[in-house]
Amino acid sequence: MQFLSLSRRLIERHGVEAFTPELGARESRRVQEMYAEGKLRQVWRRGDTPGAAILWEAADEDEVRALLESLPMFQLGMLEIVSVVPLHPYPGFAPK
C-alpha cells in the first residue's frame, strides 16, 4: 500500500544553524537506504516550509511512522511528522 507523508523541520525550536551539512548528509544516507529497500518511492522538498513530502510503500501506517522515526532529524527531535495519508488507486484510469 502507498502512503504520502508530510514533515517539517522544527527550525523555530532549534534554529537554522542546528541543521548542519553533516546532519543533512546523515539524513540523506538514511533516505537512500530506505529507497534501496523499496520503502521510500519518491521524496520532494516542500515548497511552503522546510521539510519533505515522501511517497512510501508499506504494509500500514505504523510501518511508515517507524521508517520516519528512523530518520536522524526525527531522532534528535528536529523533525515533526505533520501527516501520514493512505493512498488508493484513482479509478478514473481503470479499464472499463
Per-range role (PLM):
Residues 1-96:
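Conserved, structured core segments of small domains
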